[in-house]
Amino acid sequence: MEHKPNEFVKRAMKIDIIIVYIQRYRKGHEVHFVPPLTGIHLAALTPAKHTVRVIHQQVETVNLDSEADVIVLSFFSGFAPEAYRLATEYRKRGKITIAGGPHVTFAPEEALRFVDSIVIGEGESVWEQIFQDIEQNTLQQRYIGEAIPLTNIPTPRYDLLPPQYFIRRVVQATRGCPFTCSFCTVPVLNPGFRTRPVEAVLNDIRYNKFKWWWQRKTVWFWDDNLTANRPYIKELLRQMIPLRKWWLTQASMDITKDDELLDLMRDSGCIGIFFGIESFGQESLEDAGKRQNKVAEYQGKIKKLHDRGIGVMAGFISGLDGDTPESIRDMANQLEEIGVDVPFLSILTPFKGTRSYSKMMDTDRLRSDLGWEFYNGYNVTFVPSKMTPAELLKAHRDLWRSAFSLQAIFRRIGRSLFTLRGGAMMMCSIMNLFYGLKALTNNEPISFEGTDEYKSIRETIDLIPYSRQNSLS
């Protein structure tokens, strides 16, 4: 069945925004910690005359027989096969399909094989135009979003979130990051560093129509580097103090050089900071482009947060060029020694648009037998420098099991009783128990090796991540 755009001219439409997901753990889980911002942000930008729903495939079932007129699909590379499967099914049912997100930006020609229209880059500047064009039967194949000032960003549609998310108030105050880590797409996707007006951010924080007290109390900043603009963040934090919230975000370790900032973070209710530590090896840090990280300083920097009762979440990447199976397994002990409260453990994934991808292409190290579903942070998509792909996968899983063993979980929780304030201790304990339960029930990250779920899609549409055709590298 072909869709007929003329049907939609000059009338209100039903729009489904689907945040595409492929399960990353063996058994999945019914409750997730924090929702993505994209869907409820786009919903807030949608003209009021239209009816919009946001479906998070991470926690909700996608209805292929939806009554929606327009289907919007947003996805990362690891979820591209599922996005294309959904798009194919929706087009059979006569729906207008639109795709956007990081993967579409870096693989536009590929995406256009499955949808009617794509958004490249940031979507705010073209979002309203898309629906005007649908009404006029002039929908374009491509819309190029510009990196516009963040002065008119509305409060997200929190009312459209499903109940399965533990934290619900997700906020963005800034966009971009001044650093250029080799594995990160942010410098290309979100160029420059931009800030929203402080009062607009405070309006989001004041939104309080949530069921549970911790949802009304907690703010999760979905910023890539919230503290990069020091005058801005200090003013925001001063304004947040009277609101008496708990908040978490991501920042660079260089914040520990600024005691005034750390004190403001404490006074405004910070309970957790995520640092991208990535590695304990100098060669691996150089491979990651993490010039700002100094291994000898890790413990002292984390202590400065603990001295203020703030929890430290930290990301570690396995598979950088300096890594060996032994160094990866050793990270379980090393992250304990420096005082990390909640570790996040991933495998290097060379996404299109990153220097890692270009490097792997140039050295012929991308694995040519794998589809996009492997690009989810938990599978090996390239040939490592000092081990085989199988050795890297095993070392990562050994690290994961060790870091989330019951002994490690309760050591971290026990330490938090003496180093963290109440909100930080509670949040870090919940996160640790969340992952500890996974380890206890063998709910590990899925290894896609040997699985055929998306084989037919790969064969049909020739999704080849390593292809130079139509790629931005």
Curated annotation (Swiss-Prot):
Gene Ontology molecular function, alphabetical: 4 iron, 4 sulfur cluster binding; cobalamin binding; metal ion binding; methyltransferase activity
Q: Which cofactor does it need?
A: [4Fe-4S] cluster
Name a Pfam family for this protein: Radical_SAM
Q: Which UniProt keywords apply?
A: 4Fe-4S, Iron, Iron-sulfur, Metal-binding, Methyltransferase, S-adenosyl-L-methionine, Transferase
User: What does the record say about how the cofactor binds?
Assistant: Binds 1 [4Fe-4S] cluster. The cluster is coordinated with 3 cysteines and an exchangeable S-adenosyl-L-methionine.
Gene3D superfamilies assigned to the protein according to its UniProt record, in alphabetical order? Cobalamin-binding domain (3.40.50.280), tm_1862 like domain (3.80.30.20)
Quick check: keyword Kinase in the entry? no
Superkingdom of origin organism: Bacteria
Where's the B12-binding domain? Answer: 1-141
Under the heading SMART domains, the entry gives: Elp3
Binding of [4Fe-4S] cluster, residues: 177, 181, 184
CDD domains, alphabetized? radical_SAM_B12_BD
Q: Which InterPro entries match?
A: Cobalamin-bd, Elp3/MiaA/NifB-like_rSAM, Methyltransferase_Class_B, rSAM, rSAM_horseshoe, Tetrapyrrole_Bchl_Biosynth_MTs
Gene Ontology process terms (BP): methylation
Q: Where is the Radical SAM core domain?
A: 163-391
Q: What is its EC number?
A: 2.1.1.-
Judged by the first EC level, this protein's enzyme class is: transferase
Q: Which family does it belong to?
A: Belongs to the methyltransferase superfamily.
Q: What is this protein called?
A: Uncharacterized methyltransferase slr0309
